[in-house]
Amino acid sequence: MEERRNSVRRLAGAVIALTSITATACELPPGVRVESERLSISYWTIPAKIAVGQPFVLELAACPKTSAPVSERVRFDAHMPEHRHGMNYRTKVVPMGGGRFHSEGWLFHMPGRWEFRFDVGTEHLTHSVRIE
């Protein structure tokens, strides 16, 4: 009986250890953090300051809030809600593995409020920025 209890204790300890490792395994790098119900993302641009009429790169890291893997079915875009139009360019997104993505083809052609849209699997996340 004691042997069975010890086995159950070891199993419970292993489950707790594995759960804590899984929960901390996905850490987001510094950047702008955006949350949805099932996903946390961090994104940053290169260069860090977006200038009107200048191309930039966007990098994004995603961490699921569940045990599900991050989908590589993604689409990134931006639009100007007040003007009801988007960019004049289509972005290209390359999955880098491990929930990380590299995206090129960004250019904001006019100043004002832009809204990034990040579609990752079935999750839709948005974040607004003001470009002067």
Q: Residue ranges of each PLM-predicted region?
A:
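Bacterial N-terminal signal peptides
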Residues: 12-22
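Contiguous segments within soluble domain cores/interaction surfaces
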Residues: 25-132
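Bacterial N-terminal signal peptides that target proteins for export
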Residues: 2-12
